[in-house]
Curated annotation (Swiss-Prot):
Keywords: Gluconeogenesis, Glycolysis, Isomerase. One of its GO terms (biological process) is glycolytic process. Belongs to the phosphoglycerate mutase family. BPG-dependent PGAM subfamily. The active site is at H11 (tele-phosphohistidine intermediate), E89 (proton donor/acceptor). This is 2,3-bisphosphoglycerate-dependent phosphoglycerate mutase. Catalyzes the interconversion of 2-phosphoglycerate and 3-phosphoglycerate.
Amino acid sequence: MAVTKLVLVRHGESQWNNENRFTGWYDVDLSDKGRTEAKAAGQLLKKEGFTFDFAYTSVLKRAIHTLWNILDEVDQVWLPVEKSWRLNERHYGALQGLDKAETANKYGDEQVKQWRRGFAVTPPELDRADERFPGHDPRYASLTAEQLPTTESLALTIDRVLPYWNESILPRMKSGEKVIIAAHGNSLRALVKYLDNMSEEEILELNIPTGVPLVYEFDENFKPIKHYYLGDADEIAAKAAAVANQGKAK
């Protein structure tokens, strides 16, 4: 049976992950730890014999630089790369830039958990006059007013990720190309929910660690057979737990 593999990687730790702030579409870079994580991901992929034909990432530098570091480690910096806003992190609305723990102290752990992980829950909306609104950013100049978010739930994130999966990524895989996607916690959760047919309750508890390759294997009909992380299982579990704890009051 022919098996097709897809590699998903959440970007390495960003500067705002390190500061425990809501990031969303704000374009922060990797922290030093994040760059180390990205390089380690590339080294793991090289050790396991992975090579690629095409790469996808978002238009945010923390994902782009993660991909650069991975491709450098697997000696494929020449690889064609497609960047799309559809792979961006979920837009966190007016929460962007706020400290997660301070927000939890103010609104409570459960409210912040719903804002961070709830399927259909949207954070407080961003005013379109706010400098954080993506309509002020030239990289989004080609988007329509309806496509520019002022806030997003995971459900809305899925609505923009899945068309891109079906129209661009999956056809490339079906043509035989080996694909890697470097993206974000919630754009990848959106894809994982679809691939694994997860319920809204199940996706609430899913936390994707930074900088760890997640491998999906598909059968000849491009149905997922299994998935697994590369690396030490205990370390990966600890990193996922740390992601879950970011939104709790101190």
